[in-house]
Structure formats: C-alpha cells, structure tokens
C-alpha cells in the first residue's frame, strides 16, 4: 500500500529509520510478556489529530530524546499481531531520520523496551537476532546509501 489511505480498522503508526553519522541504525529491543525479544525501529501510534509526520517527530523525541527533521517516507507496512494477549492490526509508515547525535536520552520509553543499540550494517547482516520488519537487514542497505525509493513501498512483515 503506497497511497495516503489508512486501511479501515488499522491502527496508524509512524516508525523511524534513525541513522547516525557512522551510518549505524538505532534499534530498540522489545520484550513481550512471554519473554520473547526482538529488535524494532523507534516509533508508535498516532495520537488524535496527529499526522504521521507529527507522530514520527514525537516518538523520536520520546524514545530517543533527539530532535531532528524528517527525511523521506520510504516504506509502509501493515501487519496483524498478538501482543500480550491483545490483537492489533497496524499500518505503519517508515521515515528516514539522520542525526549528528548518537547519545540516546529517552524521555518516555515504552515499558516493553529493554534495550537500545546502534547497529552497523555488517552486524545486522550477520546477526541471528529477530528484527521487525523481517527484511530490515536487506532493505536498510539502500537507505544507508541514500538511495531512496521513488515511492514508498510495502516492506513486508
């Protein structure tokens, strides 16, 4: 899905592909109640009246303490999942953000976040950790090289 429409019934959310000057990607380690851990990009749901861009800036500030201008919207993702016994159908837009600061100062971290890490591309390629979206390690290479898609595309679950 690459148009501006939010699928009916889906929770809209913004996600951030945050890159530092060394071209490392910031990921947050999330943990479910059952102990399963995986790595995700910063981001979260839109609040009433927010645009996707507003939510991306707010989530960046809350989850990292950083303020930065947004780059392009490059990916979308719709996925349904169970989180701690609750069903969620989520539609996400991913925005590129480049920062000069690699010091994270979370202001309002979500309770499920148990860690942060700046990931070099090579570490992403060789890791056996779980990432969301699953194709993150494949798709982030062109973003690091500033080769952005002409239109946002579905990055898969």
Q: What are these regions, as identified by a protein language model?
A:
Residues 46-69, 77-131:
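Unchanged
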Residues 11, 34, 41, 68, ...:
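Short connector loops at helix/strand junctions that flank enzyme active sites
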Residues 2-25, 71, 96:
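Conserved N-terminal beta-strand and adjoining loop/helix that marks the start
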């Amino acid at each position: 899905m690459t148009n501006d429409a939010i699928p009916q019934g889906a929770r809209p959310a913004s996600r951030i592909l945050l890159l530092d000057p060394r071209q490392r990607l910031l990921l947050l380690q999330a943990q479910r109640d059952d102990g399963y851990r995986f790595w995700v990009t910063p981001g979260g749901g839109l609040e009433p009246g927010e645009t996707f861009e507003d939510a991306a800036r707010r989530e960046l500030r809350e989850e990292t303490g950083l303020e930065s201008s947004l780059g392009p919207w490059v990916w979308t993702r719709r996925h349904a999942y169970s989180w701690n016994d609750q069903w969620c159908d989520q539609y996400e837009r991913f925005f590129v953000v480049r920062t000069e600061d690699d010091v994270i100062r979370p202001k309002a971290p979500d309770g499920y976040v148990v860690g942060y890490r700046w990931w070099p591309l090579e570490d992403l390629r060789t890791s056996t950790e779980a990432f969301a979206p699953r194709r993150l390690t494949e798709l982030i290479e062109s973003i690091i090289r500033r080769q952005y898609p002409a239109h946002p595309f579905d990055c898969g679950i």
